[in-house]
Amino acid sequence: MALPILLDCDPGHDDAIAIVLALASPELDVKAITSSAGNQTPEKTLRNVLRMLTLLNRTDIPVAGGAVKPLMRELIIADNVHGESGLDGPALPEPTFAPQNCTAVELMAKTLRESAEPVTIVSTGPQTNVALLLNSHPELHSKIARIVIMGGAMGLGNWTPAAEFNIYVDPEAAEIVFQSGIPVVMAGLDVTHKAQIHIEDTERFRAIGNPVSTIVAELLDFFLEYHKDEKWGFVGAPLHDPCTIAWLLKPELFTTVERWVGVETQGKYTQGMTVVDYYYLTDNKPNATVMVDVDRQGFVDLLADRLKFYA
């Protein structure tokens, strides 16, 4: 039986590819998709969800827009990474359907309430919508199987020296998620920076030759340009968000550890840092499964295999 999931995202090139991977995988049943502000403004990320589902011919999936700003802060966006539209590069179709007439939290709550079994929440943007759901619907916590997030790092940040972008945008929300008592799986930069797509991988995807694989290749063409900056030391572009979906499909591709994770909300230099108690230096019990390594070639092979679904 397919695993029911609820996807909360802020497309974003890598979010878009995570959607492609999820909807090409019969092991997963995508119940709804909600959008958050982050990689671009809330209006643009919502539109990008609708554009991707129009491309994939999955306008049957309910969509709702989420919070327009973080819980306690002003919004920061990553337009320098994802371009003016949030999905610069390919020519994507205009949406042929509208979002639901409700908020992201209302759609999430409805989805959980109506599901016969607990739902896995996959959150690949800031954690604002998920935190609002947890705070406003404590009665639904038992309907959440786990929360799989792309965010954080045990080491270096990518937005500040200490913080990864998604967590930095709304650290208070991320702290609510990590301390919720619900199982959390963290795909942080430690693993996503190893999930790099090289130029030859992009050409492999392009050669599959269907409209979706071509769009994915064009998304990666744009994404690779930003990551060519020598400061990163990358060979290709790190495909952050699809690691969450890939872990659900093939956990054997990933090395994980069970650790306690907290989020720094106050530090002068460290706001948004995920503090991982790797060496068990506190009495805090582990609250997260933390990804630390990935079989890069296996990850690329999985993407290539699933892109053939769209032939």
Swiss-Prot record:
EC number(s) from the headed UniProt entry: 3.2.-.-
Pfam hit, one: IU_nuc_hydro
Biological classification of the source: Bacteria, Pseudomonadati, Pseudomonadota, Gammaproteobacteria, Enterobacterales
Cellular component terms (Gene Ontology): cytosol
Gene Ontology molecular-function annotations: purine nucleosidase activity; uridine nucleosidase activity
Top-level taxon in the UniProt lineage: Bacteria
Biological role stated in the UniProt entry: Hydrolyzes cytidine or uridine to ribose and cytosine or uracil, respectively.
Family: Belongs to the IUNH family. RihA subfamily.
Enzyme class: hydrolase
Name of the protein in question: Pyrimidine-specific ribonucleoside hydrolase RihA
Any one GO biological process: purine nucleoside catabolic process
Active site (UniProt): H240
SUPFAM superfamilies named among the record's database cross-references: Nucleoside hydrolase (SSF53590)
InterPro entries linked: I/U_nuclsd_hydro_CS, Inosine/uridine_hydrolase_dom, IUNH, Pyrim_hydro_RihA, Ribo_hydro-like
Keywords attached to this entry: Glycosidase, Hydrolase
